[in-house]
């Protein structure tokens, strides 16, 4: 069986997670006042944790867009002229519904018992690129934003692969958000659409390190069964 991009990143996370478990690592918590903790627990939190891009030493696709004056416009299902991407929904996962980020093309969340502690999610964002785009440059810079995440510890530098017949780059590891050690698997796919318009597909898998065994089969399913029609 071919190991495709997102599943490869998840496998990298698994290796990192085993190391963390062996060291007795666990997510840390901030020293917040008791009343603040009570208030936070009473307010429903979104199942898809937001991720804010962080500045860092590694060059990124966003930086390339700024320098090359390229505009990225979010694309949603059914938008005229856009590629059609059919993602499978793996066993034990459901559509994110109202928790889907406004700019996302598609999102799913884990609905198993392990999600009671923290909800693993996989989010796909599709963007139409306007300007003079170098597709290979997108692949070369794909890992930058992931490597710039706070406290990122990668399992290697990432690898090139493909999804649905289109070139991709994947990277996985762990990072720290709000005092918690988290696992991440990111994949960037470059799609040559109609009239040679370039689209950028980004897949972001999010979980805690000890939830990777649950997330891994889902990423394998997505990598093996996703179809892309330009």
What spans do the regions from the language model cover?
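N-terminal targeting sequences that direct proteins away from the cytosol to non-cytosolic compartments
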Residues: 2-104, 206-230
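Short, surface-exposed beta-strand/loop micro-motifs that present aromatic residues
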Residues: 106-110, 183-194
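A short acidic-to-branched-hydrophobic micro-motif
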Residues: 108-137
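Extracellular/periplasmic catalytic domains that process cell-envelope and extracellular macromolecules
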Residues: 115-118, 162-164, 192-194
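Post-signal peptide N-terminal regions of Sec-secreted extracellular proteins
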Residues: 125-131, 143-149, 176-178, 187, ...
